[in-house]
Amino acid sequence: MSTPSARTGGSLDAWFKISQRGSTVRQEVVAGLTTFLAMVYSVIVVPGMLGKAGFPPAAVFVATCLVAGLGSIVMGLWANLPLAIGCAISLTAFTAFSLVLGQHISVPVALGAVFLMGVLFTVISATGIRSWILRNLPHGVAHGTGIGIGLFLLLIAANGVGLVIKNPLDGLPVALGDFATFPVIMSLVGLAVIIGLEKLKVPGGILLTIIGISIVGLIFDPNVHFSGVFAMPSLSDENGNSLIGSLDIMGALNPVVLPSVLALVMTAVFDATGTIRAVAGQANLLDKDGQIIDGGKALTTDSMSSVFSGLVGAAPAAVYIESAAGTAAGGKTGLTAITVGVLFLLILFLSPLSYLVPGYATAPALMYVGLLMLSNVAKIDFADFVDAMAGLVTAVFIVLTCNIVTGIMIGFATLVIGRLVSGEWRKLNIGTVVIAVALVTFYAGGWAI
């Protein structure tokens, strides 16, 4: 006779195809917790950035958790992929500093712009345009995007703990930070520990490292302190003003605002699409043609999350590259994403706990994932010289410009021009050329973020 737990495990396994994809329920939950810890910083960073632009931080905190929670749960249930949704940091910065502070657009109009961006983004996804872009993504550029994102993660993590800093002097743009600081030492030691644990195939090695460093930080770092467990979420500021449903769609249709909406859409299309492709590839969730399994559902969920963001008062949403931390921990199904979503909904009431995980506890995980993504170099076909070089150009300029879309644009342009100059124009397809022209025009017109 089967026990209730066995039946539960069986139903989970059947729904999420856990065994079929070579995983276990425990492995998926650990992967989800790993991803959550790697991206929980967003509930602090996003309210802080939008708060500088006049958004009520407490209300933004709630909205950020709702977007990440519900978006990730839908991704898991519908697309069955280990991809976590959250408010995109780059698009949050654009919303706060360019739209509101730079163009002096009101908060309701900015939220209307986010909503319109989400609607256009969803139309592009639902009509198959995003899938078409993925089908016309050259192999070199696709693998180069994965390499570039890996390098980008390494730079983000190293800069976040002060290992690499902006050069205060003339010369190169970056410089070595203070190597002897506690965050830097903990990050590098943590990276080495993760590598050792992964070599030994210790289950949940990344998660154990994050928890271990957090405990060390709580003991020795005065900036990490226990301030309680529970806190009731607030949907409005101290004056009772709520962001939910406060968007001004008609204001966002103003000709002055529309170019910014289109810039958000173009950036999201290529940034998020490249991220989803890279993380799915890292998790071996591509079919025999190199396309994402149930990719259409993932792309639509990703875009619809931005519609929800505009309604509840948050920044545009996107799949987080930190999802790769979960796939590195073994996540292969939507149960990973659902775990992330449930944890974000719980953190609504446990917000003090989010401050117990310092940046230097998650930095080693991001560094390790970045290193893993560099393995995409081995997937590049160097027998096709132009395609291979375009891929490497994509990778290098993603990290040099700190912008995924810019790297993809330069990679596409390099491929098309390289094919023409080398006499290999017959290898080009119309889709690749159209995307290259669209991206170059987007940048030449000054609309890029």
From Swiss-Prot:
Pfam families noted in UniProt: Xan_ur_permease
Its biological purpose: High-affinity transporter for guanine and hypoxanthine.
Family the UniProt entry places it in: Belongs to the nucleobase:cation symporter-2 (NCS2) (TC 2.A.40) family. Azg-like subfamily.
Record PANTHER family: GUANINE_HYPOXANTHINE PERMEASE GHXP, XANTHINE/URACIL PERMEASE C887.17-RELATED
Gene: ghxP
Organism (species): Escherichia coli (strain K12)
Residue spans, topological domain Periplasmic: 50-59, 98-109, 163-180, 223-254, 313-314, 350-360
Transmembrane regions: 26-49, 60-78, 81-97, 110-129, 142-162, 181-198, 203-222, 255-283, 297-312, 315-330, 335-349, 361-380
Protein name: Guanine/hypoxanthine permease GhxP
